[in-house]
Amino acid sequence: MKRPEKEAVVAELTEQFRNASAVYLTEYRGLTVPQISDLREKLGRDTSYTVAKNTLFRIAAKEAGIEGLDEMLKGPSAVVFVDGDFIEAAKVLRDFAKTNKALIVKGGFADGTVYDAEGAKQLADLKSRPELLAELAGALKGTMSKAAYLFNALPTKVVRTIDALRDKQEKAA
């Protein structure tokens, strides 16, 4: 690749680093083209799986202001740029690596933090935003039904207390 071509690739990669909500670095040695295509399909529209030279990735990451990825950029590397839910992408990578041992997740970068391979696995174990919202909605629904029961129970208790006092006064009289 000639210098102008490399500069164009670096500019494109830099833009991808800047726009991504997260970045995962993988080693793809041993994956076939159909397996890589399958991975790209599973990752979905909000991600891109990019193969380039490590030097170009390093330069682009540095220009995008991302430090700490150099140690992970050794050997054949591909970068997953995530525009959407980066936890969901981590889960897809984890699951794909379970069935395709050739894929190795080296680490990543999300929310201003660099993660090693173990950190990327921990991200995959987190619940996704929709799952957390569903849990919150369920908790709120339960709390609201308890509150409704409580609000209905208070007037009933007051009425029973008044009836008991009236009965007591009638017996005393």
From Swiss-Prot:
One of its GO terms (cellular component) is large ribosomal subunit. CDD domains: Ribosomal_L10. The keyword NAD does not apply. Pfam families: Ribosomal_L10. GO terms for biological process: translation. It comes from the Bacteria. Keywords: Ribonucleoprotein, Ribosomal protein, RNA-binding, rRNA-binding. GO terms for molecular function: large ribosomal subunit rRNA binding; structural constituent of ribosome. The keyword Cytoplasm does not apply. Part of the ribosomal stalk of the 50S ribosomal subunit. The N-terminus interacts with L11 and the large rRNA to form the base of the stalk. The C-terminus forms an elongated spine to which L12 dimers bind in a sequential fashion forming a multimeric L10(L12)X complex. Forms part of the ribosomal stalk, playing a central role in the interaction of the ribosome with GTP-bound translation factors. PANTHER family: 39S RIBOSOMAL PROTEIN L10, MITOCHONDRIAL (PTHR11560). Belongs to the universal ribosomal protein uL10 family. This is Large ribosomal subunit protein uL10. It comes from Bifidobacterium animalis subsp. lactis (strain AD011). The gene is rplJ.
